[in-house]
Amino acid sequence: MKYEKDKNWMKIALKYAYYAKEKGEIPIGAILVFKERIIGIGWNSSISKNDPTAHAEIIALRGAGKKIKNYRLLNTTLYVTLQPCIMCCGAIIQSRIKRLVFGANCNSSDHRFSLKNLFCDPQKDYKLDIKKNVMQRECSDILINFFQKKRKNKIHICKKI
C-alpha cells in the first residue's frame, strides 16, 4: 500500500523532471508532501537561473517553506527522481523533513557519500526515513536519454569544426 502511494507521488515528481528536460535543464523533479497534499514543487533550473543551487530539491523546499511560513518542514516527505547531492542533503537536514523517497541512484563523484552516515547516525538528533529505487527504471531512463542526446549533439558539433 505505502509503495503504491510512493509510486503515485513519484509519478508527479517525474512530470517535473520532464518539464525540466523540455527547458533544457538536467531532468530532475521533486515534490514535498504534507498530509497527502503537495506543498512544494521543484525541477532543476540551474542553467536558466544561472544559479548552482537551483536544484529540484532546493526549489521544492524553498517553496514549501514560503507556503507554510516556516523553514522547518516537519512531518513531510520529499519525493525526488534522483538521489540528492550533498548540498541538497544539507538542506534536507536543516529543514528536518521526515522522509526521503528517491528514484534513481547516482554514482557520480559528488554523490559518493553515504546517505546512511548523513542521516542515520545514532548520535545525531535528526533521523530520516529513506526509501530508494521507487520507479528506478523510469527515473534513470530520463537521465540516461538526456545525457546520451547531449553527448550526440557534442559529437555533431565537433565534427562540424
UniProtKB/Swiss-Prot annotation:
Keywords carried by this UniProt record: Hydrolase, Metal-binding, tRNA processing, Zinc
Q: A single GO BP annotation from the record? A: tRNA wobble adenosine to inosine editing
Enzyme class at the top of the EC tree? hydrolase
Which InterPro entries is this protein grouped with?
APOBEC/CMP_deaminase_Zn-bd, CMP_dCMP_dom, Cytidine_deaminase-like, tRNA_aden_deaminase
Q: What does the record's cofactor remark say about binding? A: Binds 1 zinc ion per subunit.
Q: Name one GO molecular function term.
A: zinc ion binding
UniProt-annotated catalytic positions: E57 (proton donor)
Query: What EC number(s) is this enzyme filed under?
Result: 3.5.4.33
Q: Which SUPFAM superfamilies match?
A: Cytidine deaminase-like
Q: Could you tell me what reaction this enzyme catalyses? A: adenosine(34) in tRNA + H2O + H(+) = inosine(34) in tRNA + NH4(+)
Can the keyword Hydrolase be found in this entry's annotation?
A: yes
| Hydrolase keyword on record | yes
Residues that coordinate or bind Zn(2+): H55, C85, C88
Query: Which cofactor is recorded for it?
Result: Zn(2+)
Q: Which residues form the CMP/dCMP-type deaminase domain?
A: 4-116
As for what it does, the entry says: Catalyzes the deamination of adenosine to inosine at the wobble position 34 of tRNA(Arg2).
Assembly: Homodimer.
Entry similarity comment:
Belongs to the cytidine and deoxycytidylate deaminase family.
The protein in question is named tRNA-specific adenosine deaminase
Q: What is the lineage of its organism?
A: Bacteria, Pseudomonadati, Pseudomonadota, Gammaproteobacteria, Enterobacterales
